[in-house]
Swiss-Prot record:
The record marks Y162, K232 as: Critical for catalysis. It comes from Pseudomonas aeruginosa (strain UCBPP-PA14). The lineage of its organism: Bacteria, Pseudomonadati, Pseudomonadota, Gammaproteobacteria, Pseudomonadales. This is Isocitrate dehydrogenase [NADP]. SUPFAM superfamilies: Isocitrate/Isopropylmalate dehydrogenase-like. Keywords: Glyoxylate bypass, Magnesium, Manganese, Metal-binding, NADP, Oxidoreductase, Phosphoprotein, Secreted, Tricarboxylic acid cycle. It catalyses: D-threo-isocitrate + NADP(+) = 2-oxoglutarate + CO2 + NADPH. GO terms for biological process: glyoxylate cycle; tricarboxylic acid cycle. It is found in: Secreted. One of its GO terms (cellular component) is extracellular region. The gene is icd. PANTHER family: ISOCITRATE DEHYDROGENASE [NADP].
Length: 418
């Protein structure tokens, strides 16, 4: 495929998807990356250096990533034209090369695209936002036992109120929808019908089941003990409540789960280990308490878009903040790994910020590719650098006797501890 601005590496091969949706990964895979806006200029080169070092150490030159820069955000407006924030060829390349990674992207000012991150997820149907949350020993935390937190969140990415189906108060569209609801549907629960913004919350059986299926399969593949469906079904019975019901259906129909003590909780035997996997549900507001009071009781979380946003950031705060929180957006075939924090433009180009989020997202990427030896080295390097208290400013200011490192120096410290 020919591209207008993207330079395809001269050496390197594509990752391909097999019929069973497993990956066929060559020894020199081409990986598209989006540098990112703001601090993307600092963290992306460090991530690439750390990943290359881990791959070299793990495979002694037998494997090597061929990095291919693709463009989105402010850099795309410089490379293409000022109105092109998300070029079609970037979407094509990410889809075509299967596995990619991105830095943080800014939200364009003005109309058109509300969020580049949401646009990428929707246009590539990356319906799972996967966020593992764990504590690295030595990372400053506001809670007493951050080590009890070891969860993986599966957040539905394509539906819920994030679908963006809403209309401004006073607009003809909002008034038309409100009129239809009150006059045609007999709705009497809208307290103020004038000057009222209105939105739609789509939650489908198909969208729910494919998300929960991914979470259950992850629990099986990674020897996890439970999957918790987090919802607000006590209030929103036909959307969030349906999410819970459809989730249990997947566990029963596709994984052979049976009622536990009369239900509604269920359990099934992991076919790979023989251990029981418990499938349970928790109301979203109670879950925000539980992650503080009893985090050790939770393992894999499957939830809708808005709940997942709240939960993943709240959990990240318990283990040291979003500076080191990794994430991935997945479809059945395409995987895009990402820094989960913002662009922090005031720090851009200062070689100051923590590159941990993007580096640990790259660790997830390597594991996804089956390159577990290299992924393990990144975890080892991260643990080593933090244990030695050689850290960036966000950790250094909260740790006694720590050595302050720049962004690039922190990457070098990780490499040294591999």
């Amino acid at each position: 495929m020919g591209y207008q601005k993207i330079q395809v590496p001269a050496t390197g091969d594509k990752i391909t998807v097999n019929a069973d949706m497993s990956l066929s990964v060559p020894k020199n895979p081409i990986i598209p990356f989006i540098e990112g806006d703001g601090i993307g200029v600092d963290i992306s080169p460090v991530m690439i250096k750390v990943v290359d070092a881990a791959v070299e150490k793990a495979y002694k030159g037998e494997r090597k990533i061929a990095w291919m820069e693709v463009y989105a955000g402010e850099k795309a407006t410089q490379v293409y034209d000022q109105d092109t924030w998300l070029p079609q060829e970037t979407l094509d390349a990410v889809r075509d090369y299967v596995v990619s990674i991105k830095g943080p992207l800014t939200t364009p000012v003005g109309g058109g695209i509300r969020s580049l991150n949401v646009a990428l997820r929707q246009q590539l149907d990356l319906y799972v936002c996967q966020r593992p949350v764990r504590w690295f020993e030595g990372v400053p935390s506001p809670v007493k036992k951050p080590g009890d937190v070891d969860m993986v969140i599966f957040r539905e990415n394509s539906e819920d109120i994030y679908a963006g189906v809403e209309w401004k108060a006073g607009s003809p569209e909002a008034e038309k929808v409100i009129k239809f609801l009150t006059e045609e549907m007999g709705v009497k629960k809208i307290r103020f019908t004038e000057n009222c913004g209105i939105g739609i919350k789509p939650v489908s059986q198909e969208g729910t089941k494919r998300l929960v299926r991914k979470a259950l399969q992850y629990a099986v593949d990674n020897d996890r003990s439970s999957v918790t469906l987090v919802h607000k079904g006590n209030i929103m019975k036909f959307t969030e409540g349906a999410f819970k019901d459809w989730g249990y259906e997947v566990a029963r129909d596709e994984f052979g789960a049976e009622l536990l003590d009369g239900g509604p909780w269920m359990q099934f035997k992991n076919p790979k280990t023989g251990k029981n996997v418990v499938v349970k549900d928790v109301i979203a507001d109670a879950m925000l308490q539980q992650i503080l009071l009893r985090p050790a009781e939770y393992d894999v979380i499957a939830t809708l878009n808005l709940n997942g946003d709240y939960l993943s950031d709240a959990l990240a705060a318990e283990v040291g903040g979003i500076g080191i929180a990794p994430g991935a957006n997945l479809s059945d075939s395409v995987a895009m790994f990402e820094a989960t924090h913002g662009t922090a433009p005031k720090y851009a180009g200062q070689d100051k910020v923590n590159p941990g989020s993007l580096i640990l997202s790259a660790e997830m990427m390597l594991r996804h590719m089956g390159w577990t030896e290299a992924a393990d080295l990144i975890i080892k390097g991260t643990n080593g650098a933090i244990a030695a208290k050689t850290v960036t400013y966000d950790f250094e200011r909260l740790m006694d006797g720590a050595t302050l490192l720049s962004c690039s120096e922190f990457g070098d410290a990780m490499i040294a501890k591999m």
